[in-house]
Regions:
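Short acidic, hydrophobic short linear motifs in intrinsically disordered regions
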Residues: 36-41, 139-141, 274-276
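N-terminal, positively charged regions that mediate nucleic acid binding
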Residues: 1-40, 44-58
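Short, Lys/Arg-enriched C-terminal cap helix and immediately downstream tail that follows
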Residues: 300-310
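Extended mid-to-C-terminal alpha-helical interaction segments
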Residues: 196-288, 293-298
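Flexible, glycine/charged-enriched surface loops at secondary-structure junctions
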Residues: 170-172, 275, 308-309
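Structural motif
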Residues: 15-23, 114-121, 254-258
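Short, hydrophobic/amphipathic alpha-helical patches that form generic packing surfaces
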Residues: 24-32, 123-131, 265
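DNA-contacting interfaces and partner/effector-binding or oligomerization modules
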Residues: 45, 52, 57-76, 83-207
Length: 311
């Protein structure tokens, strides 16, 4: 089961007993389906939970004659599509008009009379998500969207979302394949919206996943930093060893000044040791910068005096 399906399952488990709240939820489901008119009501979904929720709401509120169909989404897939159809046209007309829409009305807008309180708005948005909402797996990305069939409805939905007082939401929009997408990519806003419409468990799951990602990223950054440092140490050490070997072959290490001679022998014995550790292991310990300064002098000696004395 996908994360989006889990969200819809949780939303469908919300207990609601007030008739107006049930009606607002049903309104959200029907209005944002692609077939809601005075002559035809058809609801298609991949979620069996959403399909059964719609049937429950219709039967409790209007008792229409309903047919539920089920079919495989594709021949090569195990996922199914569920279609709930209100059979009788008189039932369609009765339901359509009860939500304040006029018989034969083609262009639908959100009738705000059905969203007269915060509780009704919550129920309405719960229905909208069950109808056209989806959310990505938080392990992959943060993305929640509503795929809205009409431009006017997408604009109305954005307004409803933006006016929620319990959380601050800033929906974005884009047109995709003839549909109007209202979406969120900020994890905080997604969690707030899920909690608002009745899916706090999934909201907590997203927050937990985000925390795990942050820990992993911090660990990876630390590991990458350590690997990079090891690489730098190895490169610098190889350069120093080459210079010392060159001195050894030409004028001899014992010809070096005492401070350079000591660190040269220590480097030969400890090719993987960091500059900090080299400095601490000298007869008179010095800092990392002090050890680095001696190594730079050693490299300069190998590049200048060795060439002169080695002719």
């Amino acid at each position: 089961m996908s994360f989006s399906s889990d969200v819809k399952k949780e939303i469908c488990s919300v207990e609601q007993f007030e008739r107006e709240a049930l009606k607002a939820e049903l309104y959200g489901m029907l209005l944002f389906s692609r077939n809601f008119s005075s002559k035809k009501i058809t609801f298609t979904t991949e979620s069996n939970y959403a399909g059964n929720r719609l049937i429950f709401l219709l039967q409790n509120l209007y008792m229409p004659i309903i047919e539920k169909q089920s079919a495989l989404r594709t021949k090569s897939s195990d996922s199914r599509l569920y279609k709930i159809i209100v059979i009788d046209e008189n039932d369609c007309k009765r339901i359509f008009e009860d939500f304040g829409h006029i018989y034969g009305q083609v262009t639908l807008r959100v009738n705000r009379a059905n969203l007269s309180s915060e509780e009704l708005t919550q129920s309405f948005l719960r229905g909208v998500f069950l109808s056209c909402g989806s959310i990505s797996d938080p392990m992959k990305s943060y993305h929640l969207e509503f795929c809205v069939p009409h431009k006017n409805l997408s604009q109305d939905l954005c307004k409803v979302l933006s006016e929620i007082t319990e959380c601050t939401l800033a929906p974005k929009t884009v047109v995709r394949s003839g549909s109007y997408i209202v979406y969120f990519k900020e994890s905080e806003q997604i969690c707030d919206l899920l909690t608002y419409i009745g899916a706090p468990i999934r909201a907590m799951e997203i927050m937990g996943t985000k925390a795990i990602k942050q820990v992993r990223n911090n660990v990876n950054r630390r590991i990458n930093g350590e690997v990079a440092n090891i690489g730098k140490i190895a490169t610098a050490s190889a350069k120093q060893l080459d210079a010392i070997e060159h001195i050894k072959r030409t004028v001899g290490i014992d010809s070096l000044p005492e401070d350079l001679r000591e660190i040269a022998y220590l480097r030969l014995e400890n090719p993987d040791m960091s500059l900090r550790d080299l400095g601490q292991n000298l007869s008179t310990p010095i800092s990392r910068s002090g050890a680095n300064h001696r190594m730079q002098r050693l490299l300069e000696y190998a590049g200048t005096e060795v060439k002169t004395n080695g002719k």
